[in-house]
């Protein structure tokens, strides 16, 4: 188990979790296919299938496919920084309403192979009903008792899926929880008790007053080599 957890921290999380979502710059959009844009549809399929798809966005989706699906006016190309500012990655922001926005991170600047989908809105959920905003109590019902990293550091609140009932999603899905915005001010002792570079059980009583909810989902489609 120790080697497994170490592998998660050094490979999966380092490569996938810690890309900065802040754009370094945005590229101008060109609408070259007005007929295609007119046919664009809203994101009605919001099912997350770890390792396979987020709605219609799959392992083989390209930027041109996104234009056909949603229209160029809903897309903004970005470049995001890698962990600790090392490296950069092409990304495309999909701006929709009703909790359906998301960010596609690409394997290279051709934007023809997605690495992952992240910054998901609350409308996107797995078959188990897990989505952004799911409270810790519900996560425990679906995942069983699991381990997660402490709060307030780079990988804070990341769930170790190999310790849960959803271990089959390991390497395909990254889930990170966070406390309510005022949790530290209201419950500093509880907050500090489950903070830092350490793993804690989801049944630890110090979580209870902190308003823990799922804050981030990353759906891995084509893992980095």
Go through each PLM region and give its residues.
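Bacterial N-terminal signal peptides that target proteins for export
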Residues: 1-9, 19-21
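Short helix/turn-capping signatures at newly exposed starts of structured segments
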Residues: 22-155, 164-165, 173, 184, ...
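Short, solvent-exposed beta-strand-terminating loops
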Residues: 175-181
């Amino acid at each position: 188990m120790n080697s497994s957890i170490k592998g998660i921290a050094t490979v999966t999380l380092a490569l996938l979790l810690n890309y900065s979502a802040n754009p370094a710059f945005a590229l101008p959009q060109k609408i070259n296919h007005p007929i295609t844009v007119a046919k664009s549809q809203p994101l009605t399929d919001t099912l997350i299938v770890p390792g396979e798809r987020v709605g219609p966005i799959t392992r083989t989706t390209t930027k041109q496919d996104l234009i056909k699906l949603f229209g160029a006016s809903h897309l903004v190309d970005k470049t995001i920084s890698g962990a600790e500012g090392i490296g950069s990655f092409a990304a495309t922001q999909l701006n929709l309403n009703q909790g359906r926005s998301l960010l596609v991170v690409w394997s290279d600047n051709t934007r023809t192979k997605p690495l992952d989908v992240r910054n998901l809105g609350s409308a996107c959920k797995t078959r188990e009903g897990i989505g952004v905003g799911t409270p810790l109590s519900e996560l425990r019902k679906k995942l069983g008792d699991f381990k997660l990293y402490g709060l307030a550091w780079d990988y804070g609140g990341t769930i170790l899926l190999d310790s849960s009932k959803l271990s089959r999603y390991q390497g395909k899905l990254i889930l990170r929880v966070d406390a309510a915005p005022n949790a530290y001010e209201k419950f500093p002792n509880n907050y500090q008790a489950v903070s830092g570079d350490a793993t804690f059980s989801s049944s630890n009583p110090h979580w209870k007053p902190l308003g823990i909810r799922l804050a981030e989902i990353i759906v891995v489609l084509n893992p980095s080599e």
